[in-house]
Amino acid sequence: MRDAIRRVEHFSIQVPNTPAKAFGVLSTLVSAGINLLACSGVPRGRRAQIDVVPDDTRRFRSAVRKAGLAFTPRKTGFLIQGNERPGALAEHLQKLGERNINVTGIDALSAGEGRWGAIIWVEEDAVRTAARVLTASAKAPAGRAPRRKAPPARRASRAR
């Protein structure tokens, strides 16, 4: 089975680094029916940064606007999900490297039950090219380049 690849957007918000603030933000998203593909948080001095990758960016933007949450867009990346196998992530990184696309970050993990997932972040000016490269690698069996359709055979012209 081939890996599923889709473009994703990353958003960030800073809140006071106090108990239950992250819960308050996340419960607001839950109440709005927002599904998150990824979420992480880190302390930033007296503040805490919450980073999220929503499943539906348009719906997320609408919900945070209505709730008055000050999420800011940060970067664009690619969510890759598939069956676990040795070198699964490396296959995609190799394709990007061959096209001289710099990867600025990777978040990867085992999803359990033989599945894995990763988000690969690239520079904004490389998003379109990376999308083409990753989509092509998703369509080809592992370790092989996509097959190209052979041009139709030409008939030899007859001399009259």
Language model: regions and residue ranges:
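A conserved regulatory-domain signal marking ACT and ACT-like small-molecule sensing domains
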Residues: 1-160
